[in-house]
């Protein structure tokens, strides 16, 4: 059963990228909760589940349609800062998502998402937030050439490296900032989820590229 107003299409082609992302988040809810208990107020996993648990998998529909649905899910269903941040990011991504896949156009969409997230809360790289994964991924796409497979793989690596960097930092934004040094050594769960989006994207793109020659 799909829930209005944020349901994805019940018919059409499977959206492999976003299905892979949502599946990964589903499978890691307990891990996300544990991380946030160490470096926050412990509700991050609950908020992710609230946003995504109602979806029947696989998700169906084109990227813009599913991104729009995910945006509404986070804005309507998820509580806390994470709902607003991810809802804002997915909304900007959906609004700018290209009809024809190209590295340059996707880079512009991701950059728009980053800009909206930073405008929302003012976070910068080093503040131990989603921006620590999103900003390097956006920069990697900005600098990439037209090889879709290579560009998305590079963006995924950049996001993962950004997550790793959050382990050695303390938070300067949100409730995680209240715990100070207790957050050091713990990766930011929001940055981690952001990296999974790029990881899923790169993985599905690699599969598609091995099946066709549309990537170069």
Report the location of each language-model feature.
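N-terminal loops that bind phosphate or other acidic moieties
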Residues: 1-216
């Amino acid at each position: 059963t799909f829930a209005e107003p944020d349901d994805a299409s019940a018919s059409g082609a499977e959206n492999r990228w976003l299905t892979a992302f949502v599946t990964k988040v589903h499978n890691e809810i307990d891990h996300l909760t544990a991380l946030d208990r160490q470096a926050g107020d412990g509700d991050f996993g609950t908020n992710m589940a609230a946003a995504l648990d109602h979806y029947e998998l696989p998700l169906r529909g084109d990227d813009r349609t599913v991104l729009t649905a995910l945006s509404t899910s986070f804005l309507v269903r998820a509580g806390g800062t994470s709902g607003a941040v991810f809802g804002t990011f997915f909304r900007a991504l959906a609004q700018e998502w290209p009809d024809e896949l190209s590295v340059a156009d996707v880079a512009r969409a991701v950059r728009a998402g980053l800009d909206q997230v930073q405008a929302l809360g003012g976070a910068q790289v080093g503040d131990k937030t989603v921006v620590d994964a999103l900003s390097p991924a956006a920069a990697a796409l900005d600098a990439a050439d037209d090889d879709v497979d290579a560009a998305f793989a590079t963006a995924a690596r950049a996001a993962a490296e950004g997550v790793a960097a959050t382990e050695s930092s303390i938070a300067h934004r949100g409730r995680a900032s209240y715990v100070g040094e207790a957050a050091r050594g713990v990766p930011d769960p929001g940055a981690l989820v952001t990296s999974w989006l790029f990881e899923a994207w790169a993985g599905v793109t690699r599969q598609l590229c091995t099946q066709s020659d549309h990537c170069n």
